[in-house]
């Protein structure tokens, strides 16, 4: 295992870099490691990023300064992209990258085969929230995992107690409202997948709250899904004590100033924790953090769930520092009453000064807001000051009294940040110890040793002479050997193993130092040099093809058909008991076989559903939650004890849980597993899954390519659904319809109200809660692949699924009738498409399968 992943190693500060300036800012301000993306296959497509051609220079820059470099390769990779991905990976290995951050499990397989020595870090896009899932990816060769941001300190403690996997935790930066790797909003609404680095940030848009069909007034809280930013510098000490290996700052799309300020802050916090010293961020430090980028700060989920605190909802963008409110207009400016948080503040810290940029917040951040540069500041009282502006910069007559004043730019901070990295240097060097050995009349050897114990040496043939006047002293040796400018090293210890009367010329010592240090640097680079198996992808593809043509995988129960049976099947997922009754009744009218899956809000009703279905002689499957946290195994136990014929697996922890049990039910992989290529599909088939649902990120051509390279008959393709867009720990029901922090005191408004979120176009997106109190926002428009079903059948697919949301029993039967005709070959799909367009008030969309 790489020393970058050792669980006993010193905790690491990991900073982001979207460009060269941010890279320098991170290094100069104390980062131990930097993560960044290349021009493709990274989850921040809009960042400047680096090219593959630049990567050797990037890694040389970092390694010369004793900093590690991790390449973010954290998107799903489609089948037709695997060849390009393999080429990128070879370049990454050859450039000396210290690790790759990966989402796609198929890509993990490829890396382990292509470059076994390259460390793989599991991206937060893997949605790892429970020890079983973490152990699953460890078995695949992942050497570190980046935990989901929705975990609390207690969750992390439980995980750390049950796995030896090194853990990485986000401690600062933007928070996604949805679980990373589980957000399909951008894909559903615009074909720009967050799993492909193209998030459209729909969570930062305004929404109206529709409760039981009526508009619910939310005041100035329009941004119902826009979380505040994470800032956990106060929690570094307990996280260090939990054994967290790496502290991660979000921000590859942010400025170098932000990277510099955040890195400084967390460097100080980590160092204080390691020294067992208390850490309190100064007032200036807090202002600097807020000024560099802030939508308001929160400890996120690290301190536990608080639905009243996570989303403030007034604005979706960085505001900077809140100065106060406008209380008076003057002939040339305004009078501001300072915000209460500045009471009793350090007078040496200037809150507002000439040259600062401000904006006036009247509660409409989506509109053009007034603002400008401050020309003069005059104190009126301890709590009030007058700000004046240049002529024409601010239309004072239009300013409303009571509006909030934010400082959006601080030139002094920008200058300080730029100075911190402007010299393009870093004090961060690695210690080197020297042993100088020799005998009179013999050779003189200098051995250099780094902090890992790696050594290199240089030798002078001598002969080593006896000093006539000035024998070599330790002081002289340290002076000559300490001349390490221009190298990544700084002098540690020096030990002399020489006769006391020996003399060595300074020129000889200098030459030995240069050669030993050069050799040590070369030895370090040699360790980073890794074997690349160029045929890895071809080998894996041959294995996948062999698996696809191997003996069929029978269903695990009598209720499931064997994969040898070519007859198409139509499955249905229901979300209410009424829909289940309708589906069971409908199955009595059709010759098509298939499973009915239950995805109920309350898993306690699963046993009732199983009994009902079995009483009517029909097989049934039960869906797990998409997320499983430590301590939630009881939810899986209820599913296991319900006696279903199949379980719809939606996370790796659930897969591992059911693999530990006797094989009583078929385990069918659902869409949250993000299967986007034949390598990941084959991985899950090898884990014993008879069927898989492909990723919703695939369009038709991409899906067809994966079907061609796999056993197409083992894919279950969802052909009708309301796309699940946001899947989030944040509960809108609790936040907006109660005063409760979490499920213990919210009063469960989700049981009493039907809620939707309405966007600026008038589209209303249904909201649902699950047993874990996690919310899913669904697309308002159903997605239909009816027209694609004949093509899928022609390519060997035979399992199709219809998912219901709020359909009535009558609508359920009618919908299943239409799709049954297409699956049975009685309709080309076009007629069904036209019928759905007519009968659905909002129509239907071809959605993700539509070619871009």
Where in this protein do the model-derived segments appear?
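Glycine-rich, highly charged phosphate/nucleotide-binding loops
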Residues: 50-55
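Surface-exposed amphipathic alpha-helical tracts and adjacent flexible/coil segments at the periphery
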Residues: 1-28, 33-43, 58-59, 65-72, ...
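Conserved phosphate-binding/catalytic loop of the ribokinase/pfkB sugar-kinase fold
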Residues: 126-130
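Conserved non-cysteine loop/helix-boundary elements of the Radical SAM core domain that shape
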Residues: 45-49
């Amino acid at each position: 295992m790489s020393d970058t992943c050792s669980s006993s190693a010193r905790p690491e500060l990991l900073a982001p870099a979207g460009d060269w300036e941010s890279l320098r800012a991170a290094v100069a301000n104390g980062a131990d490691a930097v993560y960044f993306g290349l021009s493709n296959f990274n989850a921040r497509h809009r960042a400047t990023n680096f090219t593959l051609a630049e990567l050797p220079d990037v890694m040389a820059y970092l390694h010369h300064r004793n900093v590690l470099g991790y390449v973010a390769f954290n998107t799903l990779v489609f089948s037709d992209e695997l060849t390009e991905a393999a080429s990128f990976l070879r370049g990454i290995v050859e450039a000396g990258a210290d690790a790759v951050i990966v989402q796609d499990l198929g890509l993990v397989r490829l890396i382990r085969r292509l470059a076994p020595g390259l460390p793989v870090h599991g991206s937060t896009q893997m949605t790892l929230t429970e020890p079983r899932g973490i152990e699953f990816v460890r078995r695949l060769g992942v050497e570190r995992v980046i935990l989901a941001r929705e975990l609390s300190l207690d969750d992390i403690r439980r995980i750390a107690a049950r796995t030896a996997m090194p853990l990485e935790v986000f401690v600062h930066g933007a928070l996604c409202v949805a679980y990373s790797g589980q957000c399909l909003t951008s894909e559903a609404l615009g074909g720009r997948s967050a799993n492909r680095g193209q998030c459209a940030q729909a969570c930062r848009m305004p929404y109206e709250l529709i409760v039981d069909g009526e508009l619910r007034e939310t005041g100035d809280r329009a941004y119902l899904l826009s979380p505040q930013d994470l800032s956990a510098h106060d929690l570094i000490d307990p996280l260090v004590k939990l054994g967290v290996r790496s502290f991660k700052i979000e921000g590859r799309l942010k400025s170098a100033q932000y990277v510099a300020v955040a890195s400084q802050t967390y460097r100080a916090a980590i160092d204080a924790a390691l020294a067992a010293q208390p850490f309190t961020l100064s007032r200036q430090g807090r202002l600097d953090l807020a000024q560099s980028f802030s939508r308001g700060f929160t400890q996120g989920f690290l301190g536990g769930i608080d639905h009243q605190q996570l989303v403030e909802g007034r604005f979706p963008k960085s505001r900077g520092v809140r100065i106060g409110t406008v209380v008076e207009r003057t002939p040339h400016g305004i009078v501001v009453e300072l915000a209460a948080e500045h009471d009793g503040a350090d007078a040496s810290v200037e809150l507002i000064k000439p040259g600062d940029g401000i904006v006036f917040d009247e509660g409409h951040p989506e509109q053009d807001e007034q603002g400008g540069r401050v020309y003069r500041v005059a104190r009126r009282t301890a709590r009030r000051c007058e700000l004046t502006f240049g002529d024409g910069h601010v239309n004072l007559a239009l300013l409303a009294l009571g509006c909030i004043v934010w400082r959006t730019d601080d030139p002094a901070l920008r200058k300080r940040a730029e100075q911190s990295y402007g010299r393009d240097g870093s004090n961060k060097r690695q210690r080197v110890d020297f042993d100088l050995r020799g005998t009179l009349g013999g050779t003189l050897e200098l051995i250099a040793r780094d902090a890992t114990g790696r050594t290199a040496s240089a030798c002078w043939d001598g002969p080593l002479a006896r000093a006539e006047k000035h024998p070599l002293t330790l002081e002289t040796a340290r002076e000559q050997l300490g001349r390490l400018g221009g190298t990544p090293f700084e002098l540690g210890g020096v030990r002399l193993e020489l006769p006391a009367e020996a003399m060595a010329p300074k020129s000889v010592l200098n030459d030995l130092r240069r050669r030993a240090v050069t050799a040590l640097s070369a030895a370090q680079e040699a360790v980073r040099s890794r074997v690349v198996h160029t045929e890895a992808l071809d080998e894996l593809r041959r294995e996948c093809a062999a698996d696809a043509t191997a003996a069929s995988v029978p269903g695990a129960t009598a209720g499931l058909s064997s994969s040898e049976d070519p007859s198409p099947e139509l499955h249905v997922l229901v979300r209410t008991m009424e829909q289940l009754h309708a589906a069971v009744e409908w199955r009595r009218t059709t010759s098509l076989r298939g499973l009915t899956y239950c995805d109920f809000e309350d898993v306690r009703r699963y046993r009732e559903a199983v009994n009902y279905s079995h009483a009517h002689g029909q097989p049934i499957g039960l869906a797990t939650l998409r997320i499983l946290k430590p301590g939630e195994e009881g939810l899986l136990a209820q599913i296991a004890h319900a006696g279903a014929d199949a379980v719809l697996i939606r996370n790796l922890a659930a897969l591992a849980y059911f693999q530990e049990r006797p094989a009583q039910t078929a385990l069918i992989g659902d869409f949250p597993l993000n299967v986007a290529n034949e390598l990941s599909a084959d991985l899950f088939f090898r884990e014993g899954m008879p069927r898989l649902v492909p990723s919703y990120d695939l369009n038709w051509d991409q899906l067809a390519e994966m079907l061609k390279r796999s056993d197409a008959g083992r894919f279950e393709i969802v052909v009708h659904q309301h796309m699940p867009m946001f899947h989030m720990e944040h509960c809108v029901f609790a936040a907006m319809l109660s005063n409760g922090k979490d499920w213990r005191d919210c009063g469960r408004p989700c049981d009493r109200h039907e809620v939707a979120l309405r966007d600026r176009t008038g589209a209303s997106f249904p909201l649902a809660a699950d047993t874990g109190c996690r919310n899913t926002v669904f697309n308002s428009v159903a997605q239909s692949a009816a027209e694609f079903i004949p093509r899928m059948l022609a390519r060997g697919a035979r399992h199709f699924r219809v998912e219901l949301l709020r359909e009535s029993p009558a609508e359920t039967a009618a919908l299943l009738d239409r799709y049954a005709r297409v699956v049975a070959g009685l309709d080309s799909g076009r007629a069904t498409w036209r019928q759905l367009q007519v009968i659905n008030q909002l129509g239907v969309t071809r959605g993700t399968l539509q070619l871009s």
